[in-house]
Amino acid sequence: GGVNGPRGWATCNYVVASSMQEAVLIDLAAKVRPGVPVVFLDTGYHFAETIGTRDAIESVYDIRVLNVTPEHSVAEQDKLLGKDLFARDPGECCRLRKVAPLGKTLRGYSAWVTGLRRSEAATRANAPVIGFDEGFKLVKVNPMATWTDEDVQNYIDEHNVLVNPLIYEGYSSIGCAPCTAKPLAGADPRSGRWQGLAKTECGLHAS
């Protein structure tokens, strides 16, 4: 089906990806298409709060959570590649635990929908609302690309949207626990990710 307007979105074969940081995108998607599949990349390294948020979101919204896990558990990866790969080669850890599992999951779909926003970081400043994802070879839709932090907060307040409690502890961008810290004062919201490393993206949004 086409992707022009809500009717097109209701019929197009797409999946929503969520980090379970907040449920704004999920709230929007569930209203347009009840029962929409939502991918959550369960890396094995998440904060307990993130897993709790995922479970709460799944019980509150009319969605179908696809809990996607990597080929190997953390313990298996430690045995195969040595302990704490994230500390030695974060790029490879993200590839194995996020990018590859998502790639496999997306094979059955014609588009994926993300909560990517231009205001999150310089690396995302040119994010299109609709584009073609060269990495995963399918249409990528970022319906919130132009939203500001204020827009997100207003929507959360207005619609009583579920939020990961870590947000209120000062974490503005939440990923795997070992690679997530609170952002630096005055820096962009994603500055707490991979602090001290020359890395700003996990690779899911590389293209």
Task: Describe each PLM feature range.
Residues 1-207:
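Nucleotide-activated chemistry modules centered on ATP-dependent adenylation/adenylyltransferase
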